[in-house]
Amino acid sequence: MTISTLSSSYGNAQDVPAEDSDRHGSIEPGSEKAANAVERSGIPILEVKNLCHRYPHLDANTLEEINLKVYKGERVAVLGANGAGKSTLFKHLNGILKPLSGEVLVKGEKITKKNVRMCRETVGIVFQDPDDQVLAPSVEEDIAFGPINMGLSSEEVEKRVKEALKMVGLEGFEERAPHHLSGGQKKLVAIAGILAMRPEVIVLDEPTAGLDPLSSARFLELIMKMNKELGITLLLSTHDVDVVPYFAERVFVLHHGKLEADGIPEEIFSDPELLRKAHLRLPRIAEIFEMLQQEGVDINIKITAEKARDEILRVMDSRFQTFRMG
């Protein structure tokens, strides 16, 4: 099916209800700017103030007085055990859910009924289960859905679909039926659908869940590329602590709907008690270093393989020098 046929099938954005046309999240052009060093000053691209949320069937709040800021170009991990409130928080970031109290600001503007479409054109969301998001009969139709409903020309829609497919490595999949794809491939289609709308922020809910180690690594490489080459601000939720050191510049820790910590990965993972309180653990590499500390070895906890190597070499050199002097 051609893009022009797709356009006539879907109609214009003005003819489609907001809740339908925004099912992918959305975007505003601007992703062509190269990623620059993040400056945590000025107006945050996302800000959450005193956010509380409660589902109707529950007696307690799912989110309790959440306050956080995310700045343009950052890569942020939201770390928490299952049930910590990560998905609920993410659904507030472009107005899918409404707060019980508090507010969410996108580029300094509070999300309201009047501007929710603009907010969804800035913040795109990739859901944990791609079957909740990839719904069209073909890959091409699914990726074209958002751009068509932005009112773009057939030529521009086709261009964006091709660019998005190339970015996620699915060239040649245009006519494939999504239900014939693997789980990992469906997640890539979901991301392509968001990329085609060129958002400034992409929120990914447990993106590596259900993926094998190789697919998970490739997925992380892709989203790092999106950040570095397109300048897209990224928020990623996960309970996989081994993923975080290789992705995040900053980490939020959620526990029972409360924000327990906000810091760089080295700070967060140097506090084992914080992680245990949040029903998490140290990354495997850091666990080894913690055990060495408990054995009396004078060694600093490291969280990536490269830094662990450097620290081990430092300790070995120090002991060698001590041995020579003795």
UniProtKB/Swiss-Prot annotation:
An annotated Gene Ontology molecular function: ATPase-coupled transmembrane transporter activity
Region (Disordered), start-end ranges: 1-34
Residue ranges occupied by any ABC transporter domain in the UniProt entry: 46-281
Compartments where located: Cell membrane
Membrane topology (UniProt): Peripheral membrane protein
Assigned EC number: 7.-.-.-
Key words, A-Z: ATP-binding, Cell membrane, Membrane, Nucleotide-binding, Translocase, Transport
Any Gene Ontology biological process: cobalt ion transport
UniProt main location, coarse: membrane
Chain residues that bind ATP: G80, A81, N82, G83, A84, G85, K86, S87
Similarity field: Belongs to the ABC transporter superfamily.
Function recorded in the entry: Probably part of an ABC transporter complex. Responsible for energy coupling to the transport system.
Identification of the protein by name: Putative ABC transporter ATP-binding protein MA_4020
Native species: Methanosarcina acetivorans (strain ATCC 35395 / DSM 2834 / JCM 12185 / C2A)
